[in-house]
Amino acid sequence: MATMVSPSLLAADFLHLDSEIEMINRSEADWLHLDVMDGVFVPNISFGFPVLEAVARKCTKPLDVHYMIVHPEHYIEQTRKLGAMMMNVHVEACTHLHRTIQEIHQAGMKAGVTLNPASPVSLLEDIIDDVDMVLLMSVNPGFGGQKFIENTIQKVQRLRELIDKSGSKALIEIDGGVQNETAPRLVQAGADVLVAGSYVFGSKNPEQVIHDLRTL
């Protein structure tokens, strides 16, 4: 399977969001990754539903929505109305994770669970069969452009072992510090989907960068 690429809108030029999304539409990107932050669960505020709704109207790629917020279960219905393909929630933010995953599925979306860098893969043992994707944070969440946390490679390998052992069909997505040096190692370790923000949007030729990531 070709590596999937989900460029992160957080790194886009928000003064020219229209043209940035047109570029994504033209590109070989598989999805568009949308980071929603509340300033409580993570130390930053990004954007909310007015921006999400505007992006959804323009973007022709499936929307991969990542909630870095407290009580993400409160926004399942609004996320469904956007037409989102995937709703990612943090293990650390959900008191009743199994119920939240069920509710996401009942709303007609795929359900992803996200682990912060310090959270072990073992937290997923009793939920791995129920999720469509696991998103591993390879930087501490909240800000783009951070340095890649090196032990993510071993974490991907452990997650791949867990998925293969359980027979789960969950994809492995990586978010943070994805660039030309880390991306091949992540794919070799077992990653299926790469989220790339500044590496794509900060490039002189973002469409070529997306193409190159997909051919790893």
Question: Where would I find each of the regions flagged by the language model?
Answer:
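Conserved N-terminal beta1-alpha1 strand-loop-helix module at the mouth
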Residues: 1-88, 94-96, 103, 111, ...
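Glycine-rich beta-strand-to-loop/alpha-helix junction loops that act as flexible
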Residues: 174-177, 195-199
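Short beta->alpha connector loops at strand-helix junctions that form conserved
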Residues: 90-92, 116, 137-140, 197-198
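Short acidic loop-to-helix transition motifs that present clustered carboxylates
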Residues: 118-120, 179
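Generic enzyme active-site microenvironment
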Residues: 33, 173-174
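Internal catalytic-core helix/loop-beta-alpha segment
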Residues: 110-114, 118
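Acidic, divalent-metal-coordinating active-site segment for phosphoryl/phosphodiester hydrolysis
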Residues: 177-189
